């Protein structure tokens, strides 16, 4: 076993070589020991429990990591290392594997093999989602992220399924990467000094976090060495198992006890670790090499390839002188091949023309001439290998192949006879290295400066993608030339299957030759033809090296032998040479439908085509179905600004119509002034992602921009539609095989050509380069199942997976340069219309824009809903007859219409002979209007024929000419109602009849059954509106009458007066059909015209089904600012608002001087009836009764109870001491005037109160500081005494007021007159009895005193006297929009609302072409005469909408002066009609939209003959503002109801300081009230929010985590009581040994455990469970904590097991938060 020793020709090792080999072996052993002694750093895999430190230099038996501990998911251990799958996730605190003070410099040593191409992190160190350090493995790069700064990027790829080992050194100012055992490539990126890592950091192996992409592959080694010197020679630190992982076999660290293993894969990739490796280290990537192994004495000796060629030596290869390459600078000395013995230790490389033997001179001359033919070898940073010289001359290989193979084989055979294989081997080595196939140059980032040269680096000849197309070919060519039959190596790993070679022609049987040395496994070729069994060969020589015999002649084909045993799986064969293209084969059968292929790469966008010429205008087609919203049309040229028209007279107020379609975009008007801010709109829904526009021309590299923040991960895009297939091309002639040209630019995917003639089956070619992705084809039919194919190559990366979760914040990337301004992108598709936003306030009127040109006629829209009746239009002339439509399907009979007035009889025309129906021709262009024809003569009425059988439908005939109208015939008697016939062809439309007389209002009819829908008829002309009569009750639905003859159009009638709105009647019974009208006068006979082909008038078809509403139009551009609308009328009284928030508590005022009782002032004017107020303060209390037990909260009901009986006056209490003025209270709601109470008994004289100064009445503003008291104001005039009001409903129970602080004893005052009942004071001391005094003069009403501090709950007081009605308070400011509330329960029927405002009249539009019925718009003014249409079907009767819900409670008004009780008001006027459709909840949008839409006419352009008079809308505006103010007040002052919940109970106490305990609704997160919860508010305890359990025996509270967390945040303390009822159970609270106590625990909301004798020990209120007398007892535990998130208790742990004599159960109280 002599390493690197030269041998003699006879194979013996020379003595000198033996000595040197021994010395080398000793040196290697010492070096290995030194390496063992050095510090090996921190083994991350060992720290994570994935391997031991002894793996580093242990034997293969000990190199397997221990698997005694359970491995994480997705992690497996092998001899090569740790396998990570896509579900592997290993994360651990940083301090467990690395020291916190790990500073610079340090080296990261890694050995790995990637199994999947992705951009995963090898490892990462994070602190609070901030990346501190990470190594990311991109498809073509390796990135080192450091503390969020600019990362260091290396052009090094590990995703090639090969083993890689590299070292990364991080210093103070640089990051370096070392590959190939010390070749250094510096990063020019400078970074600030990295500090030590935080102790809270987290180390993640295989990914950046759990949500990111995971590394998939094998990690053999991951060490962190705290020094930078280890990176220069990091191969000394490589683990033994990593050296054996397929490729790593360095000679510098061989342990003394282990030599190089003999089992080395002969096709394993060359190592990328060691600097001593030869040229192949920079050129091999695919792992295909011919190992330099010889076999001698059963020992395997690896020889180092030290054949690096410098730049200066490349010129000799170019000039053709390959015979004497001087390689002495690299430790390679040229030597003649025919020498007896040489004691040099280096093998020599001789690429010369010296003879291998005299007879084999021809081989090397051809080989050298082949090398000399390379003319394109440059002197750049290239690498030269024997194989790379073949890259430029692929066409020569077939010429030299046969001779070269034969001669080289003979040369090798001859040299083996003379022991000269050793000298021949360098020739093979230099010929079998291929150029790199990596996507980046040399698989590393080479940052040499220009002109710099490294002596230990190699330089590739061709380093672009151009070389990769032919690497396989020449590699296989040389393998075919030099069949390594004589160099047997160990069996390698199974490689991917190579393409099958062509079947060889059976040759003649050769002579039996001597047995040679076993060769390596050959490439699996196609099976040849069976040959005859040859004669058995002589046994070969076993000792020593056998002498191979000469090659025998080719033998005859042997007979097919018996099938042998199945052999071992062969090694991966080298790809064969590409065969000549065979002729086209016969098309095979259709294969099975393949699985969907991977998505192709994004193709380059084609050039944008020029717009085609504008086509001629086509005919107007028949109306199609409503298409999708088309693209926005081009904007028309602004027209000339027209003159301002005269102001028209005011039109009749029209009904509110449906919202019309969006008009075309007008020209932009002048910029108007800044309008007031509008109400915030609702958030629109996200529209669909528009299509990706074509990519623009790539711009130049921009300047580096600032690093942006990581964006939100976008949604997954929708799958695109498959493109259309291109047109097939014509088959071309078969061309000659040309020289392969350099790869061109990546072209577009061309159209597929036509199928050519079938050719002969050609040999399979080598795998070509990755093609461009083709279009997704149409799935073919399932073909027969094919045979199982060979194992395929690794496929391309799969399609992107599903959208991942939100990743953690990534590192900050490098600043990119600012790119140039890109071309404006194409206009995107219009997104879906968002929800309608709030209407903005009416802006100032802008300038009138120019009238745009008439746009092109749009596609017919769908038939819209029937609009409101417009103003009477002028009589239109009859339109031209349309083509006869096809016969419609018989529909359902429509609902009977209300009998209308019978018009005058028309002139019946002659019934023309029915012609054969013709085929419907194409729709012609619109013709000009023809002149009106003369009236025809009256024809003679024909006799009524017998009813014939219904014939079959004939073919469509041609449309006949329109006949002249015939003479009017006599009206026949109405015949019997016949059976309804099939729907006939549509008849010609008649002229409009005269306007009928106004019919009497019929009796109310019953609602008829809704009939089936009829066929949709053609739209008729708009009828003339009749005079508006009184609204009658709905008549009964009459039966369908026979269709009458169409009468002549009547003269336009005068505009009728607007009638009064009648009350809405109840549906009446079915009415009788009306009588026939009188017979009209005979008209003049018309000219007898030719017989027309008019069809018979068909029966009315069934009503058509309501069409699907058309797509909502895109929102139009913002119009010009309209004029300021008129002030609206005063709106109806809004619903009461919510209670406002409480203001700050005022400072205690100084005690004023005692004032005299003032005189009773005159009564003020009666005020507006106020809103229903809270219950007044309790009256004087009686003697305190015994305190009753706490009652259960009453049921929550929205219906108020009946008013209670009037109470008796209570006895007069003792005179109390006057308390000090309390804190200023908040004004209560103005109460509804109540009944005047009975006069109470005269109370004791009170001490004169302090005279306060009259305060100024200010507007309602924000909560400000307490103002100074103003001077006393004059008393108001006495009001007119009001009538006795009706007994009002019982008000909501008011909150109990607090008792005032006891005042000082009062002085004995003189007897006073009987005063008004005073505010209840605190309990005073017993005063002296005063003598009854004379009645005094009535004093003026004193100012309300400040409310006292809240006292204890008092008894129910007697009802107080009704207060004087106050004046109406000032209007509050507009409030903010409140949050969206849940749909509430159905409210009680509301009163009729005030009649709404009438809308303005629309403006006339320009005359347009006759089109299909569009969406009904707002009723416009009288338009031009339109074409006459057919009568449409009767519409369905609308459904009466539900009654609107009761509005929220109104805002609390200011306290007014007390007035007398007013009289009961009259009922209000009836309300306006409700909006169509059910309305669940009135919101702010409805009020504002109705207000603004009433002024839409002001925003339109003025047309002449249109007069607009502004209507005073001030009342409506004030109603709206009042509603908004109430709405804002209700938000600021929650009521604790389900629709208006508070956050916590304390908010209710702060807003209303007089509230009583009970159930209320709260919503801690203030979202939609749907998740509000009902709680018990204990205001007596300061406003506790108490959550009752679902059941007293369960520790469940039915509150979600979100609401509970918000409740915890809003509270400062919590209380919970748990009672355990026990029967013969031991004590619960003692843990001492003296008693059988049980150390039970209580688990809180946040998981903490309450136990006895701990910091979280509950307070034991009672523990009677120690009494075990056979009776039930209880133990009560109180949990009170300042950390509310600890409560409620959700589990009781360690309870004893239940037995027959031992029982217990648990009661839970409400948990209360304060």
UniProtKB/Swiss-Prot annotation:
Bias type Pro residues, positions: 496-505, 893-902, 1466-1476
Compositionally biased spans, kind Gly residues: 1035-1044, 1065-1074, 1318-1327
Cellular compartment(s): Secreted, Extracellular space, Extracellular matrix
A Gene Ontology molecular function term of the record: extracellular matrix structural constituent conferring tensile strength
Amino acid composition bias (Basic and acidic residues), ranges on this chain: 1256-1266
Domain Collagen-like: 487-542, 552-611, 660-719, 741-797, 798-857, 858-887, 888-947, 948-1007, 1011-1052, 1053-1112, 1116-1170, 1172-1196, 1201-1249, 1252-1306, 1309-1353, 1354-1413, 1420-1479
Signal peptide: 1-35
InterPro entries per UniProt: Collagen, Collagen_superfamily, ConA-like_dom_sf, Fib_collagen_C, TSPN-like_N
Protein's UniProt keywords contain Repeat: yes
One Pfam family named in its UniProt record: COLFI
Laminin G-like domain span: 141-217
Keywords: Collagen, Extracellular matrix, Glycoprotein, Repeat, Secreted, Signal
Biased composition (Low complexity): 574-587, 685-701, 985-1019, 1132-1145, 1174-1186, 1271-1293
Chief place where the protein resides: secreted
Protein name: Collagen alpha-1(XXIV) chain
């Amino acid at each position: 076993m002599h390493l690197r020793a030269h041998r003699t020709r006879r194979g013996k090792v020379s003595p000198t070589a033996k000595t040197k080999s021994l010395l080398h072996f000793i040196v290697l052993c010492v070096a290995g020991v030194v390496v063992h002694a050095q510090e090996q750093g921190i083994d991350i895999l060992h720290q994570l429990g994935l391997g031991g430190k002894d793996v580093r230099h242990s034997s293969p038996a000990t190199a397997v990591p221990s698997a005694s501990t359970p491995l994480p998911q997705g992690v497996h251990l092998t001899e090569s290392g740790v396998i990570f799958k896509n579900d592997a996730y290993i994360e651990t605190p940083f301090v467990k594997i690395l020291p916190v003070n790990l500073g610079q410099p340090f080296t990261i040593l890694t050995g790995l093999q990637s199994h999947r191409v992705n951009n995963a992190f090898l490892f990462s160190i994070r602190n609070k989602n901030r990346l501190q350090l990470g190594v990311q493995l991109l498809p073509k790069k390796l990135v080192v992220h450091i503390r969020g700064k600019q990362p260091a990027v290396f052009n090094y790829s590990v995703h090639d399924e090969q083993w890689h080992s590299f070292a990364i050194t991080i210093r103070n100012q640089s990051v370096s990467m070392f590959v190939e055992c010390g070749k250094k490539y510096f990063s020019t990126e400078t970074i600030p000094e990295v500090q030590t890592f935080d102790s809270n950091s987290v180390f993640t192996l295989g990914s950046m976090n759990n949500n990111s992409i995971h590394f998939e592959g094998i990690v053999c080694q991951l060490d962190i060495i705290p020094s930078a010197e280890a990176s220069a020679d990091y191969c000394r630190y490589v683990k033994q198992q990593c050296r054996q992982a397929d490729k790593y076999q360095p000679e510098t660290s061989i342990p003394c006890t282990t030599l190089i293993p003999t089992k080395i894969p002969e096709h394993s990739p060359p190592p990328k670790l060691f600097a001593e490796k030869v040229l192949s280290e920079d050129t091999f990537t695919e792992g295909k090499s011919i190992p330099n192994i010889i076999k001698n004495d059963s020992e395997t000796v690896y020889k180092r390839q030290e054949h690096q060629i410098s730049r200066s030596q490349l010129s000799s290869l170019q000039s053709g002188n390959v015979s004497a390459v001087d390689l002495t600078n690299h430790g390679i000395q040229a030597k003649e091949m025919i020498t007896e013995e040489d004691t040099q230790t280096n093998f020599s490389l001789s690429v010369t023309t010296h003879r291998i033997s005299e007879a084999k001179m021809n081989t090397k001359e051809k080989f050298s001439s082949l090398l000399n033919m390379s003319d394109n070898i440059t002197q750049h940073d290239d690498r030269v290998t024997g194989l790379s010289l073949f890259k430029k001359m692929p066409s020569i290989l077939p010429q030299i192949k046969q001779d070269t193979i034969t001669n080289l084989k003979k040369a090798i055979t001859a040299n083996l006879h003379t022991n000269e294989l050793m000298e021949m081997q360098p020739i093979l080595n230099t010929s079998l290295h291929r150029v790199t196939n990596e996507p980046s140059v040399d698989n590393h980032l080479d940052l040499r400066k220009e002109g710099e040269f490294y002596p230990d680096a190699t330089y590739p000849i061709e380093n672009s993608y151009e070389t990769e197309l032919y690497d396989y070919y020449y590699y296989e060519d040389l393998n075919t030339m030099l069949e390594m039959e004589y160099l047997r190596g160990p069996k390698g790993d199974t490689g991917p299957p190579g393409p099958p070679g062509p079947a060889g022609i059976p040759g003649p049987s050769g002579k039996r030759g001597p047995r040679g040395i076993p060769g390596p496994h050959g490439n699996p070729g196609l099976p040849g033809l069976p040959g005859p069994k040859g004669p058995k060969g002589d046994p070969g020589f076993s000792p020593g090296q056998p002498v191979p015999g000469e090659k025998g002649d080719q033998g005859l084909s042997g007979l097919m032998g018996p099938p042998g045993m199945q052999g071992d799986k062969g090694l991966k064969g080298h790809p064969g040479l590409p065969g000549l293209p065979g002729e086209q084969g016969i098309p095979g059968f259709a294969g099975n439908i393949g699985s969907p292929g991977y998505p192709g790469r994004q193709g380059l966008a084609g050039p944008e085509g020029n717009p085609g010429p504008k086509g001629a205008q086509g005919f107007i087609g028949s109306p199609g179905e409503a298409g999708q919203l088309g693209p926005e049309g081009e904007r028309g040229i602004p027209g000339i600004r027209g003159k301002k028209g005269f102001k028209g007279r005011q039109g009749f107020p029209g009904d509110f119509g449906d919202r019309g379609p969006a008009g075309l975009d007008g020209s932009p008007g002048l910029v108007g002034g800044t309008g007031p801010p509008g109400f915030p709109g609702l958030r629109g829904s996200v529209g669909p992602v528009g299509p990706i526009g074509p990519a623009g021309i790539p711009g130049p590299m921009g300047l580096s921009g600032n690093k942006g923040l990581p964006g939100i991960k976008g949604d997954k895009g929708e799958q695109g539609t498959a493109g259309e297939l291109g047109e097939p091309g014509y088959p071309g002639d078969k061309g000659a095989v040309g020289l392969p040209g350099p790869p061109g630019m990546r072209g577009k995917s061309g159209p597929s050509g036509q199928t050519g003639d079938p050719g002969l089956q050609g040999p399979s070619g080598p795998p070509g380069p990755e093609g461009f992705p083709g279009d997704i084809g149409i799935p073919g039919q399932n073909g027969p199942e094919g045979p199982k194919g060979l194992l395929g190559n690794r496929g391309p990366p799969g399609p992107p997976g599903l959208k991942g979760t939100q990743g953690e914040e990534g590192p900050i990337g490098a600043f990119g340069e600012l790119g140039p301004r890109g071309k404006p992108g194409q206009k995107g598709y219009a997104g879906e219309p968002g929800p309608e936003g709030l209407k903005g306030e009416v802006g100032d009127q802008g300038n009138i824009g120019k009238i745009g040109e008439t746009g092109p006629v749009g596609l017919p829209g769908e038939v819209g809903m029937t609009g409101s009746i417009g103003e009477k239009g002028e009589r239109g002339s009859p339109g031209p007859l349309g083509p006869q439509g096809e016969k419609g399907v018989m529909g359902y009979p429509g609902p009977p219409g209300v009998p209308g007035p019978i018009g005058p009889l028309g002139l019946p025309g002659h019934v023309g002979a029915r012609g054969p129906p013709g085929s419907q021709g194409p729709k012609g262009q619109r013709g000009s209007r023809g002149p009106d024809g003369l009236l025809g003569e009256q024809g003679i009425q024909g006799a009524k024929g017998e009813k014939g059988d219904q014939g079959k439908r004939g073919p469509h005939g041609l449309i006949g000419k329109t006949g002249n109208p015939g003479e009017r015939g006599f009206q026949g008697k109405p015949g019997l109602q016949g059976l309804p016939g099939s729907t006939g062809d549509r008849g010609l439309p008649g002229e409009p009849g005269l306007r009928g007389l106004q019919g009497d209002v019929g009796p109310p009819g019953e609602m008829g059954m809704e009939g089936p829908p009829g066929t949709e008829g053609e739209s008729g002309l708009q009828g003339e509106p009749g005079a508006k009569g009184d609204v009658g009750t709905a008549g009964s639905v009459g039966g369908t009458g026979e269709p009458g003859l169409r009468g002549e159009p009547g003269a336009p009638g005068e505009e009728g007066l607007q009638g009064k709105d009648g009350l809405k009647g109840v549906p009446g019974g079915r009415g009788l059909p009306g009588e026939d009208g009188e017979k009209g006068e005979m008209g003049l006979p018309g000219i007898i015209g030719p017989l027309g082909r008019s069809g018979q008038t068909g029966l009315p078809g069934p009503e058509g089904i309501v069409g699907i509403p058309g797509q909502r139009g895109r929102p139009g551009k913002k119009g010009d600012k309209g004029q300021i609308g008129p002030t609206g009328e005063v709106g109806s009284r809004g619903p009461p608002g919510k209670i406002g928030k409480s203001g700050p508590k005022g400072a205690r005022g100084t005690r004023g001087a005692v004032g005299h009782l003032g005189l009773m002032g005159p009564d003020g004017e009666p005020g507006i009836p106020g809103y229903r107020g809270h219950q007044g303060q309790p009256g004087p209390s009686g003697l305190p009764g015994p305190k009753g037990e706490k009652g259960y909260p009453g049921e929550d009901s929205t219906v108020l109870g009946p008013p209670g009986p009037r109470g008796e006056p209570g006895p007069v209490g003792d005179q109390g001491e006057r308390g000090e003025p309390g804190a200023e209270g908040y004004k209560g709601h103005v109460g509804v005037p109540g009944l005047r109470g009975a006069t109470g008994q005269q109370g004791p004289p009170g001490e004169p109160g302090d005279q306060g100064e009259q305060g100024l009445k200010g507007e309602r503003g924000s909560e400000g500081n307490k103002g100074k008291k103003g001077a006393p104001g004059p008393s108001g005039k006495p009001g007119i005494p009001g009538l006795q009001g009706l007994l009002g409903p019982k008000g909501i129970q008011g909150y109990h007021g607090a008792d005032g602080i006891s005042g000082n004893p009062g002085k004995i005052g003189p007897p006073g007159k009987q005063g008004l009942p005073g505010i209840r004071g605190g309990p005073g001391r017993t005063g002296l009895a005063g003598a009854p005094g004379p009645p005094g003069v009535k004093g003026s009403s004193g100012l309300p005193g400040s409310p006292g501090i809240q006292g204890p709950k008092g008894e129910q007081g007697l009802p107080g006297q009704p207060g004087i009605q106050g004046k109406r308070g000032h209007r509050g400011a507009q409030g903010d929009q409140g949050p969206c509330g849940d749909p509430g329960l159905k409210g009680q029927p509301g009163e009729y609302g005030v009649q709404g405002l009438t809308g303005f009249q629309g403006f006339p539009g320009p005359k347009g072409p006759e089109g299909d019925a569009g969406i009904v718009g707002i009723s416009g003014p009288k338009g031009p005469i339109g074409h006459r249409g057919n009568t449409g079907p009767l519409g369905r009767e609308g459904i009466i909408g539900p009654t609107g819900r009761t509005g929220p409670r109104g805002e609390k008004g200011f306290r007014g002066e007390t007035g007398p009780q007013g009289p009961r008001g009259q009922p209000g006027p009836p309300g306006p009609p409700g909006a169509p459709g059910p309305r669940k909840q009135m919101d702010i949008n409805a009020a504002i939209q109705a207000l603004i839409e009433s002024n839409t006419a002001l925003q339109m352009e003025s047309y002449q003959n249109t007069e607009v008079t502004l209507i005073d809308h001030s009342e409506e505006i004030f109603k709206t503002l009042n509603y908004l103010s109430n709405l804002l007040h209700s938000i600021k002052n929650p009521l604790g109801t389900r629709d208006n919940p508070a956050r916590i109970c304390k908010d209710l106490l702060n807003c209303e300081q007089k509230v009583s305990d009970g159930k209320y609704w709260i919503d801690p997160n203030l979202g939609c009230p749907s998740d509000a919860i009902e709680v018990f508010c204990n205001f007596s305890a300061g406003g506790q929010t108490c959550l009752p359990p679902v059941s007293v025996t369960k520790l469940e509270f039915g509150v979600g985590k979100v609401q509970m967390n918000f409740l915890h945040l809003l509270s400062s303390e919590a209380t919970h009581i748990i009672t355990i009822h026990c029967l013969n159970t031991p004590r619960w609270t003692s843990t001492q040994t003296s008693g059988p106590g049980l150390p039970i625990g209580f688990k809180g909301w946040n998981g903490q455990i309450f136990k006895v004798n701990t910091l979280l020990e509950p307070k034991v209120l009672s523990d009677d469970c120690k009494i075990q007398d056979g009776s039930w007892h209880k133990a009560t535990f109180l949990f009170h904590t300042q950390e509310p998130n600890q409560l409620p208790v959700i589990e009781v742990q360690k309870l004893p097991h239940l037995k027959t004599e031992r029982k217990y159960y648990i009661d839970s109280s409400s948990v209360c938060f304060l």
